[in-house]
Amino acid sequence: MKYTAEEILEVHRMLNEEDLDIRSVTLSVNTLFALSDDERKVIEKLKTLSSMLEKFSESVKEVSEKYGIRVVTKRVAVSPIQFFLEALNERAGIEIAKTLDELGEKHEIDYVSGYSAFTDRGMTRGAERVLRTFSEALESTKRLTGMINAGSTKLGLNFDSIKLFVDEIFKMSPYSSARATIIANVPPDSPFVPSAHHGLGMPEAVINVAVSGPGVIEGAIKRAQPKTLQELHEVIKRASFKITRLGELVGRKVAEAMGIPFGAVDLSLAPSPKVGDSVAGIIEAMGIEKVGGHGSVTALAILMDAVKKGGAMATSSVGGLSSAFIPISEDAIMVERAINGSIDFFTLLAMSSVCNSGIDMVGVSKRQGKDKVIGLIADVLSMAVTLNKILGVRVIPIDAEPGAVVDLGGLLGKVVVMRLKDVNVSKFSSYTGFIPSTVKRLEMG
């Protein structure tokens, strides 16, 4: 394929002026070869991953330097730890967590993801052990991330696991709870943490890629000054095509260097705290004075559809969440809007209906209690189950009044403690069991 001089200059501008980068190159690797009822054997087998992780780290660095494309993070996704804890005790889970964390540190891997369990309809021994060690595992590590898939359109929503999850994150520091999520309909090939894990049906090892690029789309809209909604859609679609093509190039080259298959490109637009790298900035460039104002959901829906259509044209290997992320703390403009009140939890719930982010990187006040957080999570995951969407919740419990701001630094940004509704929901949150799958399940046959 030949490139015009204009296209080359455009890519140069994207990389150097509009913060286009690869958010993550993720090695997803099967670790079930290490299964055993002997903790010592599991640890020793997991340590044999060292040579693969070394090669992965070197390959990403080489590809990044060769093409002049910044890769923000290197990540590794492993098989869910639930499977290991079916035959091992809770203490073994902590030791496995520490071993994976040490491997990540040794090879300069930013995150190792997979301290995870599936509890859609109920909990096996392994799943419950993961949940009950969740806080200790993440507090004992720096790079480990974890996910609880608490629901699916096929099986329903497990209320008990939501309550256990909330108990665990209330024990965590903000830095640890930022590495924990609860989700419904989780995909098996996500390159994004904390949801990343080596899912069922995947090959032995595979490379998945997450792109970034909100600044590219915002810049394209501002330059084009579209007059109609069709023109606006087209501008976003074309920019998305170019972003995705770059992501696939990097992913395929890393996979080629490692001698393993390339998996998928996650089309999600991931913001960062840097100025000019904001999903909220795109919505405001589309004509909403402050994101959260009426019309914001429509603007986000247009953005999502155009990004997916442009991305699908650029690659036949689409995977992960493939949506727009609206993590409040990781988006500088979202932080401002949350502080001034134009963004609240109901705004985020409405936006979740048209994207796959859910409620992400938002602070909640421990002083408002667990019951309200349980209800909030149930609201988001119920939408996922009912609409057959991927949605998750990553909230940061903080011992402060609503309105407080805690700076976690780096990509995690500033966490705004947003006010939960002052309505008593303790009776509802005291229910046990699971919510049966909806009528949507019947449409699947």
Which residues does each predicted region cover?
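Anaerobic metallocofactor- and corrinoid-dependent redox/one-carbon enzyme cores
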Residues: 1-445
